[in-house]
Amino acid sequence: MMEQKQAKGRIFITNDNKMKYSLERSYEILDRTPVVLQDLLSGLPDDWVMPNEGPETFSPYDVIGHLVHGEKTDWTVRTKMILEFGNTKTFEKYDRFAQYEESKGKSLQQLLDEFAAIRKENMVWFKALNLTEDDLDKQGLHPVLGDVTLRHLLATWVVHDLTHIAQITRVMAKQYKTEMGPWPEFFRILNY
């Protein structure tokens, strides 16, 4: 339930109950992610898209490769497993760093185009499933987390997209951190 609160003379909205999972709300984000990333990254020079935050961290380029890999090996594959096998068969362990090999020789634009094409295919497939509430409650078996529901998996897919969009903008923002003089202390994004 949304409610208004007041502090220091300002009104702000809180969402203490958070959103309940909804396929429609998920589609609103999942359908937009490729366009958001295309608009943000397409045509930018390497200075913006190749730096990362240190060992075992992703550059914006790496994130797009990671998203491509996830579209091929995670969300749809695990959904099929849940719907077909329930929690009788364990998901394959996900390789968070597979994109390093899979992205070799590809430009950022190629990865953005590949991500957009695969995501579009996956969304057509997901929507054609006509999933019910009962389907969303079906369980699968994660190799680390144990029993998870399809609802958990699909909500995680949305948060995964949003997390990586935030990661990309954070890594890009840090490119100008030293050029900001004294202002970095006012920008929390630079301290993650």
Regions found by a protein language model. Give the residues of each.
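Short, contiguous alpha-helical
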Residues: M1-D16, M50-Y94, G140-Y192
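A short, mixed-charge helix-start or loop-turn motif at secondary-structure junctions
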Residues: N15-L23, E101-L108, P143-L150
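Alpha-helical bundle segments that constitute or directly flank the non-heme di-iron/ferroxidase center
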Residues: D16-W48, G70-M81
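Amphipathic, non-membrane alpha-helical segments in soluble helical-bundle scaffolds
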Residues: K20-L30, T57, L108-L112, R151-L154
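Helix N-cap and loop-to-helix transition residues
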Residues: S22, P45, S59, D95, ...
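A generic structural signal for well-ordered alpha-helical segments enriched in polar/charged residues
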Residues: V35, D39, G43, M81, ...
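Surface-exposed helix-capping loop/turn segments at secondary-structure junctions
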Residues: S42-M50, K127-L136, M172-K177
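Acidic/histidine-rich alpha-helical segments that form the ligand environment
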Residues: R96-D137, H152-H160, Q167
